[in-house]
Regions:
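Short pre-active-site segment immediately N-terminal to redox-active cysteine/selenocysteine motifs
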Residues: 23, 47-49, 53-57, 121
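Hydrophobic beta-strand core positions in alpha/beta domains
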Residues: 50-52, 81, 127
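Thiol/disulfide oxidoreductase modules built on the thioredoxin-like
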Residues: 96-101, 108-159
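Short gly/ser/thr-rich secondary-structure transition/capping motifs
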Residues: 9-10, 30-37, 105-108
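A short beta-strand-turn-helix
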Residues: 27-50
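Structural microenvironment flanking redox-active thiols in thiol-disulfide oxidoreductases
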Residues: 62-99, 109-116
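N-terminal targeting signals for export/organelle localization
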Residues: 1-30, 162
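A generic structural signal for alpha->beta connector loops
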Residues: 26, 76-77, 102-103
Length: 162
């Protein structure tokens, strides 16, 4: 019982993810904009990429969104969106309104892929290396500080690796 009480008092932003340095969960999901197309996580083997879990109903997603658009425009890293437990039409309208930073946005309607990734809530962002290993998990909105001090330096280092 003591473990449960301690666990309930922990801030999920400070709980280390058991997925760090482990293979990213495998998925095959339909594209948001072209539902007849499927993206598989294995499609990204050989490149460093980010997976951003987002939803149109998520207020914090709107807070981080301009930074993701800037990062996408910089060309530093491809960003893939995992649209989480959302309505397709609403999600597409949201991206049209706020900008679409995603190379591809895929749909996790039932949240099963989010569960596989250990999503506590949205937004969450993962940096995945060329071998498909999760190297970083950002719980909550991406911030300028997180980008400058952690995420971008990590991406640049991972891109140098063979």
């Amino acid at each position: 019982a003591a473990f449960l009480l301690v666990g309930l008092t922990l801030n999920p932003r400070q709980v280390p993810s058991p997925l760090i340095d482990k293979p990213a969960p495998v998925f095959q999901l339909n594209h948001l904009h072209e539902p007849e197309k499927v993206m598989a996580s294995q499609d990204n083997l050989g490149k460093v990429w980010m997976l951003n879990v987002w939803a149109s109903w998520c207020v914090a997603c709107r807070d981080e969104h301009p930074l993701l658009v800037q990062l996408a425009n910089s060309g530093i890293v491809p960003i893939y969106g995992l649209n989480y437990k959302d309505e397709r039409t609403t999600a597409m309208q949201w991206l049209k309104r706020y900008g679409d930073p995603y190379t591809i946005s895929i749909v996790d309607q039932d949240g099963k892929v989010g569960i596989d990734y250990g999503v506590y809530g949205v937004p969450e962002t993962y940096v995945i290396d060329k071998k498909g290993i999760i190297r970083h998990k950002q719980i909550g909105p991406v911030t300028v500080d997180a980008l400058q001090k952690t995420i971008i330096p990590l991406i640049l280092e991972l891109q140098k690796q063979v």
